[in-house]
């Protein structure tokens, strides 16, 4: 039986809105995610990439609305282990194509590398 896919679409938030959310809601606890959002906001990515947040997760895509289960990069930063977690979901009903964990200081570099690798 073939499964029917229903997109989990979410309207993208502006990078300013996301930045303010990390400042106001998390009150400095997620400084690494805030740094990444500021990096995107202040780069040429700001007009090519769309973002959305879900609690402590940043989801990035090239589409608006963002489908969380299709062509979406899910990024979290673990406050206890001080590690970045990147998970790229290309297609629904399939395992993520890309799952990586990075040291704290490598987040922005690895984000830029991922965007270049996937040609976003």
What are these model-derived regions, one by one?
Residues 33, 46, 70, 108-115:
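Generic N-terminal initiation segments characterized by hydrophobic and/or small/turn-forming residues
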Residues 65-109:
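Intrinsically disordered, low-complexity regulatory segments enriched in Ser/Thr/Pro
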Residues 1-17, 91-120:
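Mixed-charge, Lys/Arg-enriched low-complexity segments
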Residues 20, 33-40, 60, 73-75, ...:
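Generic hydrophobic secondary-structure signal
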Residues 1-66:
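Negatively charged, low-complexity tracts enriched in Asp/Glu with abundant Ser/Thr
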